[in-house]
Amino acid sequence: MDKNTRRQFLKNSAVLAAGAATLAWNDTLWPATKPHLTFPTQPRERIAVASWPFRMFIEAPANKWARDPKLPGMDLTEFPAMVVKRFGVHNFEPLDQHFPSTDSVYLKKFRAAVEKAGCHVVDIPCDVKASFYHTDRAKRKVAVEDGKKWVNIAVELGSPSIRTHIGGPPKLTPDVDRTAESLTQLAEYGATKNIIVALENDDNRTEDPFFIVKVLEKVNNPYLRALPDFCNSMMTHDQDFNNRAMEAMFKHAYNIAHMKDEEGDDKGKFRTVDVAKCFEIAQAQAYRGYFSMEWEGNGEPYAGTQRLIDETLKYLR
């Protein structure tokens, strides 16, 4: 190799090495192509408990409407230890309304309580208080930015996902294109943090399961997923519709689903769901994530949640 050739070779090598170093450093700035989570395989370890059914006990400014002063109070920091002691479950879902604060001091205190209890946050259901499909772009941006806030909170608490409501003004028809545009931004942000954004068939007007699936398929981002709720769609539809809804939702589910066997409306009328069929559908779709117990039935939440756990253990293999 002559001097000129050798000099050029060394120069090129230096450039390539510098480029490789830059790429290696920048790799941490690029989002993962898909979520990288490891799920437990033992049935009980796939069970979580939602804080929503226990809202009448939880002390938090945003939860005053649900707090029953006749019952003993509970701060959210006490919830994970209760879940472990009472139910022998080590996963839970804290609702956004149940956080008395989201400042860094409280979040550190909360995470310490979670770790001390030997528990894990597996999802944070939140309401962005805005609409992802509003006709006003500025209002859609509010939803996206609030969603990003909860993604950051999920990072601080070690949660793999958030569940956000889609939201929408009462007289505005849900719009796939505007919803997809907004949620593309949130999913892309979640990807940079390895945090999944989940959509639940919760509100039967703004979050119809088949509307959700259209949005998911349009966005086509592995960080935007479905959160199938066993019974929510039964409030306005029949079992056949629910079966089709669960099949559509579980095709797009990844890490979290809500298990319940019944749900009541504002008039005290309860609807039940075919739980066995829901688990059959989840298994057929090779769902490997968590099932969070979200009791909504008659009676009190401790016994109701235990019943859901016992029922779930019959079907998980």
Short names for language-model regions:
Residues V114, D274, C278-Y290:
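P-loop/Walker A phosphate-binding loop and immediately adjacent motor/lid segment at beta-alpha junctions
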Residues P61, N91-F92, A180-I281:
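Acidic/histidine-rich catalytic cores of soluble enzymes
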Residues N91, S161, I256, G289-Y290:
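Residues at the N-termini of beta-strands
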Residues H98-F99, G168, N201-D203, D238, ...:
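Structured beta->alpha junctions
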